[in-house]
Amino acid sequence: MSSSSSQSSLYQPRPVLSSQRFSPAPDYIDTRRSFHGDSRLPLRESTGNVQQQHHHQEPSSAHSSFNGGSLVGCYQTPVTLSPSMQSSIPPPAPIVPSQSFDCLRSLQATTSRQHHHVPPPLPQVPTRYHQRGKPRNSINPLYFWPAFRQYRNRQAHKDTQKDKGGVWRRPELEDAFVDSVLLMPHMGRRKFSMGGKLHGRNMLISEYIFVICVALLGSKEIFRIDNSNDSIEQMGRKQVSSHMQVVKKFFEDLRCFHFLFPSEEKKEPGTTNSDDFYEEEEQESFKSNPVLTALAEGRVPDVRPNYEYFSQLLALQSSITVRPKTVEIFVSSADVKIRDEVAYDANDNPLDPASFPHLGKYMNSSGDDKPNVLGKDVLLHEYTRSLDRSTSACVKTVTRRWQRDAPAMYDSLDLPDRDEDCLLLEMCSTVDLHEHAKFPSGSELTGYVEVSVTQPALQGHRWKCVTRLTRPPELQTDEGRPEMYSNESGIHRRGCADTRHEDCGCHLRPRQDIHVPFPAVEWASILSMAVQYPDVEHQRKKEKRSCGKKPDLERSASSSKRKRSEDEGDAAAWTRREPTGSDLICKVAMYQELWSCAPDSTRWTRQAIIFWRFSTTNQWYKYNPVFRPAGTTWRWLTVNDPMSRYHQQRALVYPSAGGNNMPRDAVMSPTPSVSQHLTATMSENFSQAWDSSGSNVTTHTQVHVAGGGGGGGSNMTTLFDSFPSGLATPPPTASLHGSYSASGSFDAGNGVGGCYMPPTCGGGADGPHGGLPAPSQSYFDAAGQTVNTTFGDVKPLLSGSATNPYLPGAAGGGGTGSLDLSGQFAYDDGQQHQHQHQHQQHQQQNHNGGSNGGLPGWDMGPALDSWTAGSSAGGAPAATPTGPDWGPTAPVPRMTEHHPGMWDPVHWSNHGTPGRGGEGSPRQMKRRRTEVLVDGVPVTAGW
């Protein structure tokens, strides 16, 4: 294998010799799970063609293998541009590469064969999700959803035919589209600025497909439509938007729908704006997203979707225990009689048809045609009846509102740790309030809620329901009642004679449907109290509608600008208005827990939590009264949040040439640009200021640090790989070519005039400088003992007792000093010459005869250019240089005045971890901010 040329693109991998790549010992390979069909095993290193392998064994055979060698042709970029993460961060779940990059791998292989004059192989069939011999776990899991699979089977023969209605005309673009659904982060109301334009999620998906298309075909002409004045980009975006609407319909029933497609922002019932916002600390920054960063740079992202993680989200469908079937809330009476098309109450008083419009259903029917859904009861008013389904959402949309309006309900809520433990669903009921809620005597409020049991194993269980409800103070009928209503009751069959006891025979026969007890008594008082707070604005608009007055469209159009200017005044007036019954109904919070118990067991298991959200038909939109139809809409809820950092950091797989470790760009904010990578690489490999060979620091990898790295340019490790916890800011002299000695090894004492690495464990206050180390003391020595570490292993400490988890402890049990670079003092040549004699005395006082095991500091003083190394590799440190060891210093004018505040103890009041002398670093470390991976809520226990 020959070395590659220096002009390598971002899409063409850089060949790496076998001696330059770490090849771990081959693990056990289960060919029954790792390879299918007639696929051959990858070549070993002994053959000269190294293919790195990482086979991960799990108890389940669904996701069992991971071939890291297949990533090299697609994801591997030059080593100096793709730093890998250290083992301090747990690697992601093993997964195989995305199928959307198979076309790129074949394209790269063709380019490589042309470069090396290798004859092309036989043409291959385009990689599709139904390709034989391809492992199931290497395919996007969305292809296996039954509804979408049927759609793709119907469209498969049209994809490659231009005039037959194909969506993309290339099958690889469909793979890229399906992958982009998993790759693109959820943005909410935010936009990503790229190329001077704000991009939403659909626009970013279009850009992703464009990048794949250019890498595959060389241009975007495939999106051009004849006889269209739109640009290619506009055509592609319209095509993506239309295809997105078609694909979304196949996944509407998923519990994880909101992880794939952003849920529609719905207004909070009864208010003008939605409270479903996300705080900034809950979201992952766009600057640290590798997908968006790659699109902004016009290249194919190095990351791919985590198929195993999304497969686990899709597997939530198998844990559905119940499904809503019927929700009806109505008022009926058995004492109302209908004679001669007139309804009479128990006292033979006629009822007003205008107050009870539902009586009209009985007036126009006779004999056996009369409604009999309620038996002998007559329907007087219907609050809600229709049932519809909406797409899934996060449970935070409910709990965040409760945290503000119903803190007692929020405190009593016990959410599950995982979505597999308990089913969460929401019932959003829009009720039609009665005009005066004065019903005849003998009327009853009925809440009929029925759910179907989807798990056959649960149909023979005993069931019970725990209901909790809170209401605002305005709807309280009795001041002495508790703030929260709580009730626990068993769920029995209709007509069960022993409903007060749990030992009835309801569970002896399997039940496919169960009736959820509804707190009708509580809601009867709530609905009766709500009508006492009239809604004047909606009533006025309803009267105008009944009079047949239509709004003047021309007048409204001419006053639109004035209306927009008055929005702020309308908002202020809207907030000062009196609360209405609709506003109070929206503040009612209720949830019900469904528990089941096996017939031969006494252990109750929580199967589902039903969250109730109530609103009325009188709602607001942009401070204007609007009307909504009555009905109930339900949807699935999840504990996991697609907007959280937990999800966005696990939705992607970060391939690397050295293993399954996550790259540093995933946890750095902002992500270093390409120019920053190149600058660091050139400073590392070509700058003389970074080249030295006299360091005695024991490290796992050879690190190029100013004056302390290993010599030569043979080391391919980048500057960023030297620091496992993030970037470290180089000193200002990193780009300067200093006339250093050949050895390049300087101890801590050499940097008196311009040292940018102050000591962390000084020799106490006995020296004139109050904290400078002895010439033989390392910057990372603790309690006089040498600690072998690297510059990147040291981080600033927040307090004297705080300990960074990424900071290795001292070998001798002493304190660990902190490195601080923020409060740098300015030293000029005069000050250096003035304190040179004091520094020599300080070196003699603090000399302890230890070995020089720390990293040297940076020196910017021109008078120290001819210094030699203060210590050798294996011997004891040399004494303070005298006589011929000192080179001639340049004559500099002495400062007549010395600033007394430079050595004021106030500047050294910030202590780090106690070192020798009880004092730590006085200055904070100046470095790039690194976001720490914070696990959020786990989804499965296997992570």
From Swiss-Prot:
Regions of compositional bias (Basic and acidic residues) in chain numbering: 29-43, 537-555
Protein's cellular compartments: Nucleus
SMART domains given in the database record: TEA
DNA-binding region: 161-254
Chain residue ranges for the region called Disordered: 1-69, 111-133, 537-575, 809-901
UniProt KW ATP-binding keyword: no
Any Gene Ontology biological process: conidium formation
Disulfide bonds: none
Compositionally biased intervals (Polar residues): 59-68
Highest taxon of source: Eukaryota
Upregulating conditions: Expression is positively regulated by stuA through direct binding of stuA to the abaA promoter region.
UniProt-listed PROSITE patterns: TEA_2
Compositional bias (Low complexity): 865-889
Gene Ontology CC entries for this record: nucleus; transcription regulator complex
Keywords: Activator, Conidiation, Nucleus, Sporulation, Transcription, Transcription regulation
Residues spanning the membrane: none
Main location: nucleus
Gene Ontology MF term list: DNA-binding transcription factor activity, RNA polymerase II-specific; RNA polymerase II cis-regulatory region sequence-specific DNA binding
Annotated PANTHER family: PROTEIN SCALLOPED, TRANSCRIPTIONAL ENHANCER FACTOR TEF RELATED
Biological role stated in the UniProt entry: BrlA, abaA and wetA are pivotal regulators of conidiophore development and conidium maturation. They act individually and together to regulate their own expression and that of numerous other sporulation-specific genes. Binds to the sequence 5'-CATTCY-3', where Y is a pyrimidine, making both major- and minor-groove contacts.
Family: Belongs to the TEC1 family.
Protein's name in the database: Conidiophore development regulator abaA
Organism: Hapsidospora chrysogena
Gene: AbaA
